[in-house]
Amino acid sequence: QEGVPNPLKPGVQRIPISSEDSQNIWDYLEHKTFLTRVASRIQPIRHPQHKRYAHIDLATQSLAGVSICHLAGSQLVEGLVKDGEPFAEYRLVVEYDFILTICAGQNKPINLGKIQKFFFWLRDMCGYQFGLITADMWQSEMPLQELEARNFEVDKLSIDRDKSVY
C-alpha cells in the first residue's frame, strides 16, 4: 500500500481535542485501519512486533501534529554514481502508521494531556511498543516528563529549526 494510511473516520480532517468535551483522539479514528485482533490481543496490523517511533509537534492554539512510524525492513537500492560506476546498497524502509493533525476546540485550546493519553492507549490497549517519542521544544517539557514517568523513552527534537532531520 502506497502512502501514509489515513485512520480518520469519514468526514474528519482534523481532530479537535480540548477540554470542552470528553472526546479523545481514538474516538475520531477507524480502528480497523491500523489495528487487528489476534486471539484475544489487539495489535497493530503492520509489523506488530516492530518498535514504533513518534514525534509530537505541539501547539495549543493552532495545529499540533502526531506522527508514528516503524522500520519495516530494508531494501536493496541499485544505480549508477556520477561517473557511471554501479553501486548497490541496502537502505532502511520506514513505514508510517499514521500522521494526525490536531486542532483546538471551538472555545478551548488543544488539551496536551489528551495527546499523552493517546500514547498510553496505543501502548496499553493496542499493543504498540515504542522505541522513542520525541517532541519539539515548544511546551514539551511537561508532556515528555509525564510520558517518561510512565516508562516511555523520550527526547526533544526540534525539526523546525534543524533541517538536518529532513
Locations of regions flagged by a protein language model:
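RNase H-like, metal-dependent nuclease domains and their acidic two-metal-ion catalytic environment used
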Residues: 1-159
